[in-house]
Amino acid sequence: MTELTAAAQRALTLMDLTTLNDDDTDEKVIALCRQANSPAGHTAAICIYPRFIPAARKALREQGTPDIRIATVTNFPHGNDDIEIALAETRAAIAYGADEVDVVFPYRALIAGNEQVGFELVKQCKQACLAANVLLKVIIETGELKQANLIRKASEIAINAGADFIKTSTGKVPVNATLESAELMMSVIRDMGVAKTVGFKPAGGVRTAEDALHYLQLADRILGEGWADARHFRFGASSLLASLLATLGHGAEPSGSGY
């Protein structure tokens, strides 16, 4: 097995296979559930809008893969600073049956100098998730924060407020996951001494098996080989799956773009 093939197999089991499109339907989400149960193994999770969770739960159960987790998004995609709305959306997502919630950090407030609202928003969403045994991922939107000091600060605030994962991006802005932002964020996890309890999720722009290999190499280098398991590392992606399957001998290499 080549290094690329091994990385492709590993990456497949770390995917949050995602559809977050305005034209999503129950049928499209059910098709996503089928894709998540691939010929080379199943993904860690799917990531969908909250209203589709019941249809996804039923589809995953009926196809015999109830262990594929269901992630959803809240305060998405704009990362507004209204804590009550973010909390209400998070509670609603939990009520729909989410296993994991990816909440958008109020990154514009941080850029404007307000660190407190982000801490409080994540803290309150974490309390709701903790009570329901739901994993909380915090999207800091690195492509909008841009500056290394802001990316580090948002990561630190999210972790201090209780994030189970820190995630790069919504996939809805011009610049999404990059290796540079990934290095900054995983270095914060290492430097804060929270590698046992906090994970990392690059999202948006991870499209090929080669891309996945580079992120996994980075994780191995910063946090140690073996750290990047499904409890500590996820890829938020859609088009990546076809590239991984092609690398593993299942189908042709895809063309075009995708999340």
UniProtKB/Swiss-Prot annotation:
Enzyme Commission number, as recorded: 4.1.2.4
GO cellular component terms, A-Z: cytoplasm
Major localization listed first in the record, in broad terms: cytoplasm
Gene3D superfamilies assigned to the protein according to its UniProt record, in alphabetical order: Aldolase class I
Molecular function in Gene Ontology: deoxyribose-phosphate aldolase activity
Keywords of this entry: Cytoplasm, Lyase, Schiff base
Catalytic activity from the UniProt record: 2-deoxy-D-ribose 5-phosphate = D-glyceraldehyde 3-phosphate + acetaldehyde
Keyword Oxidoreductase appears in the UniProt entry: no
Active-site positions on this chain: D102 (proton donor/acceptor), K167 (schiff-base intermediate with acetaldehyde), K201 (proton donor/acceptor)
Pfam families assigned: DeoC
Keyword Lyase: yes
Functional pathway: Carbohydrate degradation; 2-deoxy-D-ribose 1-phosphate degradation; D-glyceraldehyde 3-phosphate and acetaldehyde from 2-deoxy-alpha-D-ribose 1-phosphate: step 2/2
CDD domains: DeoC
Compartments, as annotated in UniProt: Cytoplasm
InterPro entries from the UniProt entry: Aldolase_TIM (IPR013785), DeoC (IPR011343), DeoC/FbaB/LacD_aldolase (IPR002915), DeoC_typeII (IPR023649)
General function of this protein: Catalyzes a reversible aldol reaction between acetaldehyde and D-glyceraldehyde 3-phosphate to generate 2-deoxy-D-ribose 5-phosphate.
PANTHER family (UniProt xref): DEOXYRIBOSE-PHOSPHATE ALDOLASE
Assigned protein family: Belongs to the DeoC/FbaB aldolase family. DeoC type 2 subfamily.
Protein name listed in UniProt: Deoxyribose-phosphate aldolase
Gene name of the encoded protein: deoC
